[in-house]
Amino acid sequence: MSDQKLSVNEYLKTDSNYLRGTIEEGLDTSLTGAFNDADQQLIKFHGFYQQDDRDLRNERKEQKLEPLYSFMLRARVAGGVCTPKQWLGVDKIASTLTSSNSIRLTTRQTFQYHGIPKRNLKTLIQDLDREALDSIAACGDVNRNVMCNPNPVESKLHQQAYYWAKKLSDNYLPRTKAYAEIWLGDDKVAVSESEEVEPVYGKTYLPRKFKMAVAVPPDNDVDVYTNDLGFIAVAEDGELVGFNMVAGGGMGSTHGEVATFPRLGDDFGFIKAEDCLKFAEAVLKVQRDWGNRSDRKQSRLKYTIVKHGFEAFKAEVEQRAGVKFEPKREVVIGDRGDRYGWIKGVDNNWHLTLFIEGGRIKDLPGQPLQTGLREIALVHKGDFRMTANQNIIIAGVAEEDKAQIEALARSHGLMGKLISPTRGHSIACVALPTCALAMAEAERYFPDFMTKVEALQEKHGFLEQPIVIRMTGCPNGCARPFAAEIGLVGKAPGRYNLYLGASFEGTRLNKLYRENIQEAEILAALDELFARYVKEREAGETFGNFTVRVGVVKAVIDAAKDFHG
């Protein structure tokens, strides 16, 4: 590949001195609340994005002011596990260093802050560091936060799976000292041209973002097939023996560009647990060397596999790993939702899953959620565990402490509200007003929209049955809308593309049903489909499977050919 073909980002990475760029100079500049264009790309590797308040954009323009710039910072928390002490630190940061005064749980089992002024960035990162937390590689062209079923004390198998998720996270962190130098005040280290700073990533890192997940069947809460690389735990007599490996998933696409599409990962076969890191590193290095560095819209692993072919990619991974895949083991992939309320673990401790609407932890009228979790953290002796459905688990509660934890949860509006199965299975991205890519609302609008969907379900007599519904403000797919039975993807203010037909378990994508429609049209379409579903469904048939069986949409078997066709 010639230099002329490289995307701008590749030059930026090459010239960045291993992600340093001119970030420090940008921090010292008080003339603007922003970083320059090049550093805006590099700061992603440090865990944050530059944003502005889009609700105020026109008003500030009229006042001849620059946009109200702020930053969204995402933490790296493998498997979503943190201690009560860490949670108190996370909470204090939200209350003192951000304008949103909130904590946002993400669809990848971590938390993020919105509304951070540039002047607060260094203090915030240093405060996180004091809690043994960081934001390294939470964004950027690297392996991002590794997901795992969030309750590793539910069984021995969960503990073993979490161990490997943590190893995957730690092993594939960038090795550059840029983060420590810029944010934590570590001594600067001169880097020679011959020095191998990044043994896995190299000087230009990966062509694009890379996402990993570890699933523990029958749960598929981590949506393992939507990841670049997924490991599905295989057990014998309750002990982890290895994983079925899947690779090539990814949700992002671009409206109107048929060369871009979401995709679910391919099944590659079974690997022994002790070979997990060999295969992970092999996949990363093949993607590093084979991935498209010219067109970032074609740079994800899914396009690399489609371009080179499954068999060629598999053979290269085996060659680099030095181990061959065994035939895939049979496992059952089931529910993607969280189990709300109390669950008892094998160690006789209890785990309380709390529903957090939109993942937004903030004190609301009659629901002081943030205060409630703070009060719980002050007395809780176990862990906090964030889920891929934007919820939180108070894990490791002793029998004698249950009543106190439940009383705190109920008195602060964290328990007691009846949640329908569909609402409990549904998620939305942040979108407006902070996300620069959003074309329509998601988080702010989704609760009211879900109330209207619930009314339709009640009208047709199946409110007790869950449907996986997801909404995003754009087609980048942060809330994994293309793997939802009903997916709504923002097209313009108040307008969405409506997708139908994904499987309930997350093993089949959905397909476009109606394009660029408003709420009234969406609800009318669902009203009609719900009526048909109740009359024509087969025993135990999920809504997504029904829409495919009766021909409302065609099944997506090969995304490269079927998703747009």
UniProtKB/Swiss-Prot annotation:
Gene that this polypeptide is encoded by: cysI
Family label: Belongs to the nitrite and sulfite reductase 4Fe-4S domain family.
Substrates-to-products reaction catalysed: hydrogen sulfide + 3 NADP(+) + 3 H2O = sulfite + 3 NADPH + 4 H(+)
GO molecular function, one term: sulfite reductase (NADPH) activity
Assembly information from the UniProt record: Alpha(8)-beta(8). The alpha component is a flavoprotein, the beta component is a hemoprotein.
This protein's name: Sulfite reductase [NADPH] hemoprotein beta-component
Source organism (scientific name): Shewanella loihica (strain ATCC BAA-1088 / PV-4)
GO biological process, one term: sulfate assimilation
Disulfide-linked positions: none
Ligand binding (siroheme): 478
EC number: 1.8.1.2
Taxonomic classification: Bacteria, Pseudomonadati, Pseudomonadota, Gammaproteobacteria, Alteromonadales
EC category: oxidoreductase
Keywords, ordered alphabetically: 4Fe-4S, Amino-acid biosynthesis, Cysteine biosynthesis, Heme, Iron, Iron-sulfur, Metal-binding, NADP, Oxidoreductase
Function, in words: Component of the sulfite reductase complex that catalyzes the 6-electron reduction of sulfite to sulfide. This is one of several activities required for the biosynthesis of L-cysteine from sulfate.
Cellular component annotations (GO), alphabetically ordered: sulfite reductase complex (NADPH)
Cofactor(s) annotated in UniProt: siroheme; [4Fe-4S] cluster
Residues the entry annotates as binding [4Fe-4S] cluster: 429, 435, 474, 478
Record-linked Pfam families: NIR_SIR, NIR_SIR_ferr
Pathway field: Sulfur metabolism; hydrogen sulfide biosynthesis; hydrogen sulfide from sulfite (NADPH route): step 1/1
